[in-house]
Structure formats: structure tokens, C-alpha cells
Amino acid sequence: MFTKTDIEKYFMAEKSESLLFVIIGVAAILVAAVFFFFLKTHFYKGMALPLLLIACIQLTVGYSVYKRSDDDRKRNTYAYDLNPSDLKNKEIPRMEKVNSNFVIYRWIEIVLLLAGLVLIFLYRDNTERSFLFGIGIGLAIQAAIMLGADYFAEARAKVYTKGLKDFTAKT
């Protein structure tokens, strides 16, 4: 049975994961800065590039989700008791869009992971191409992190969406 507690848990988990995204993004930026400004080899400069670029995405997405999670939680727990039609007419369509976006994100992340792995295997023994080897490692690391995080977020979103649908079908 879907309850207000399920809504609370979903948004608290969403907020926690988004904070983790922010922390990972900040850490990746710091690591990229060390690689670029202190280690300075082609390999580390190459690795810094995808770390930095994907960290910007992690910070942006993480912060925006973190910022809105409490309002979403309050709005939907309120709607659960006083206006269940809002869950049906607003929250379910929003979550269906979120779930369809996860499919897109997953394929992008898989492509980035594969691109990183291709660069790693093509240039692992080629010292003249250590920049590309570094890009491959940084890209593979960041894509794997994003893929893993989105896997859990997608699983949570599917359970939450199903709960919403079951609840609104009964009201």
C-alpha cells in the first residue's frame, strides 16, 4: 500500500543522491585542477577534461534536484491527503517524463562509457597519445559513476511511479 511515507522516502532519497552528485562533482573538479595545474602531463590533462566537463553536469543537476526536492515532497504529501487528483494529473505525468528521460540518460552514459573504453584500449600502449588515453580513463570513470547513480535513481523512480498509479487508481 502506497502511503505518505513512501512519498517522503522517495524525495529524501532523491535529495540524498543529488547531494552525493554535488559532492562527486566538487571532488572531480578538485582532482581535475590538481591534474591540470600540478601534474601537467598530457595524460593527466587529458583525464582532467572529462572529469571537469561531467562534473559541471553533476553540480548543475545535483544542485537543482537538491534545491527542489523539499518543495516536491511537501507538495505531494499535501496532495496525498487533500488533493489526490494532483498526484494523478501532475505528479504521475512528471514521473513518466522522468522515467523516459532515464532511458535517454542511460544510453548516453553507455555510449560515453564505451567511448572511454575504446580510447583506453586504443591508446594504452601509445605514449604519444597519452592525452587521448587520459581522456578515455576520465570519461570511463565519470560515465560509470553516472550510470551507476542513475541506475539506482531510475529503480527508485519506477517504484514511486507505480505506487502513485496504484494509489490514484483507488481514489
Identify the meaning behind each predicted range.
Residues 20, 46-50, 104, 108, ...:
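Alpha-helical transmembrane segments of integral membrane proteins
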Residues 51-63, 137-147:
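Canonical hydrophobic alpha-helical transmembrane segment
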Residues 85-116:
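C-terminal halves and exits of single transmembrane alpha-helices
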Residues 65-89:
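Membrane-helix interface/capping segments
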Residues 10-59, 111, 115-126:
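Long, highly hydrophobic alpha-helical transmembrane signal-anchor segments
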Residues 1-34, 90-102, 149-171:
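Cytosolic-side membrane-entry/anchor segment at the start of a transmembrane helix
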Residues 121-171:
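C-terminal membrane-adjacent module
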Residues 62, 66, 101-104, 120:
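Amphipathic alpha-helical interaction surfaces
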